From Swiss-Prot:
The gene is rps2. Belongs to the universal ribosomal protein uS2 family. GO terms for molecular function: structural constituent of ribosome. It comes from Dioscorea elephantipes. GO terms for biological process: translation. This is Small ribosomal subunit protein uS2c. The keyword DNA damage does not apply. CDD domains: RPS2. GO terms for cellular component: chloroplast; mitochondrial small ribosomal subunit. It comes from the Eukaryota. InterPro entries: Ribosomal_uS2, Ribosomal_uS2_bac/mit/plastid, Ribosomal_uS2_CS, Ribosomal_uS2_flav_dom_sf. It is found in: Plastid, Chloroplast. Keywords: Chloroplast, Plastid, Ribonucleoprotein, Ribosomal protein. It holds the Pfam family Ribosomal_S2. SUPFAM superfamilies: Ribosomal protein S2.
Length: 236
């Protein structure tokens, strides 16, 4: 895999608070190699290591995007949800930012059935068919459509399993990480100082609680994806 320059610099990461970890009492000893110091009861992540792994992740997604591969970005906690959606939309990736439904990937046939139902309901609403139903029936279907939009809206165009999954919070999205491991789908994961760096294919040590930190990491990754997509289009 060719190494490229992704303009990842330490001052920018420091300004975004990427280096701030959890309290020293709430940590995973396996994160020791990625921690550079303790400050006021908080672990500080080694940003040189963060930059290295983020650069590797950017190289990986660039290469995948340049070959037309698909991506899924997962981050359902409140601080990550908006950044996940905007980053995914910008790079034309699928995303889950509300709730991970168990079996979303490992039981893909069920997910596919839900997606077909979701698309059918959206089509009926767009054609005005729901407004012709009795009020009670229309209200029930609109509630169902709203729920499907919340949970499946980010994957409504997904027609098969993703080639790479990017996960914002390892602890919060552990179920998604497990499903990827079962299916052999490569994962890129933001890991804070309370995480296990061995669970993802590429683990990026970073603050997964600060919006600015999450946004910075995602911006670098989706920029690399977009560059890869341009390369793919140019080579077709």
């Amino acid at each position: 895999m060719k190494r490229r320059y992704w303009n990842i610099n330490l001052p920018e990461m420091m300004e975004a608070g990427v280096h701030f970890g959890h309290g020293t009492k709430k940590w995973n000893p396996r994160m020791a190699p990625y921690i550079s110091a303790k400050r006021k009861g908080i672990h500080i992540t080694n940003l040189t290591i963060t930059a290295r792994f983020l650069s590797e992740a950017c190289d990986l997604v660039f290469d995948a995007a340049s070959r037309g591969k698909s991506f899924l970005i997962v981050g359902t906690k409140n601080k990550a949800a908006d950044s996940v959606a905007s980053a995914a939309i910008r790079a034309r990736c699928h995303y889950v930012n509300k709730k991970w439904l168990g079996g979303m990937l490992t039981n893909w046939s069920t997910t596919e059935t839900r997606l077909h139902k979701f698309r059918d309901l959206r089509a009926e609403q767009n054609m005005g068919k729901l407004n012709r139903l009795p009020k009670r029936d229309a209200a029930m279907l609109k509630r169902k459509l709203s729920a499907l939009q919340s949970y499946l809206g980010g994957i409504k165009y997904m027609t098969g399993l993703p080639d790479i999954v990017i996960i914002v919070d390892q602890e919060k999205e552990y179920m998604a990480l497990q499903e990827c491991a079962i299916l052999g789908i490569p994962t890129i994961c933001l890991i804070d100082t309370n995480c296990n760096p061995d669970l993802a294919d590429i683990s990026i040590p970073a603050n997964d609680d600060a919006i600015a930190s999450i946004r910075l990491i995602l911006n670098k990754l989706v920029f690399a994806i977009c560059e890869g997509r341009y390369s793919y289009i140019g080579n077709r």
